[in-house]
């Protein structure tokens, strides 16, 4: 590939790993050009937004992703993927594929242990979206899914252990270490 891009980001989360308040947003325009070594000329727009609000031990998470390809023909490296924790949690990582990807989510997390070496949380999410060849099919042919999980904040980063579910598949189990917020985790290609 050969791409030029411009990216705008806004990050006011109080913690990259287990945030309790703030917002994260990213907007990116990518122009892939044959003159730069790409297989095909194509353009893509990616947008994501996530927010957190805490009241005592209760935390609310909300967010969404909308990634779209502006051209009809793209090479395989330009395809968006979905699946995995907080990115269509009811599906295996990278199991949803398409030239376009979008999802919305709402989540709740409860702080079980407020102090100590390993603060613990239990949470759940409800997510809706899909990957599709056509932009209009992302939400019109969307899939309901979500997760139930335990999270622990460790000195090396958070550990998430849980189960994802969807309306058309059996359960997906996950164990995840590290950040779930940011360009390399949520709304990734």
At which residue positions do the language-model features occur?
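C-terminal outer-membrane beta-barrel translocator/porin domains of Gram-negative envelope proteins
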Residues: 1-120, 124, 132, 175-182, ...
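Acidic/histidine-rich, metal-coordinating catalytic segments
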Residues: 127
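C-terminal beta-signal and terminal closure region of outer-membrane beta-barrel proteins
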Residues: 135-189
